[in-house]
Amino acid sequence: MIGRIRGVILEKQPPVVLIEAGNGVGYEINMPMTCFYELPDIGQEAIIYTQFIVREDAQLLYGFNQKQERALFRELIKVNGVGPKLALAILSGMSARQFVTAIENESISSLVKLPGVGKKTAERLVVEMKDRFKGLNGDLFEQNGDIELPASASSKAPSAADIEAEASAALIALGYKPQEAAKMISRVATAGADSETLIKEALRAAI
């Protein structure tokens, strides 16, 4: 099982990052956008904690910046009706801290704003996740003591159209319909904003 990858970032196509490990192999890793935002730029080194998921039609890696975020993902996919794709969408719309707070406060109104989460799923999340937090919450937000990596350098921005298309594609991958994703991005589009900023603002506006 692949639990941790350290390597150089080759490509970033939200919510997927391609990272080359020391053996020269490139790993495609699906990441929640709340984790994706924290990645260094292309060409820089990153450490990603991973969860390997095997399906009938695919073998997928999901990645996180902290072990605790991965632990939360593992608990989420144990909830009835919540698969890896929905768990990824949930942790893209809310940070781990925000999600824990929403569950503890039984904030159904916040949870139903997440893509793919209806009222019944939100209620199920509150019921099933509250007990699971007892084993997680104590260290969920502690620093993990990993080696600090060098700060990333600025990269050259693509065209505004490319940025908006990339941001829309990321929202579609998280479960939003194409038309809905395009509208969400157009509402927050500003000159000079990169795709990660547009995605972050679009998800924030949706909550």
Curated annotation (Swiss-Prot):
GO terms for cellular component: cytoplasm; Holliday junction helicase complex; Holliday junction resolvase complex. Residues 159-207 are annotated as: Domain III. Residues 66-143 are annotated as: Domain II. The keyword Cytoplasm applies. One of its GO terms (molecular function) is ATP binding. Residues 144-158 are annotated as: Flexible linker. NCBIfam families: ruvA. This is Holliday junction branch migration complex subunit RuvA. It comes from Proteus mirabilis (strain HI4320). The gene is ruvA.
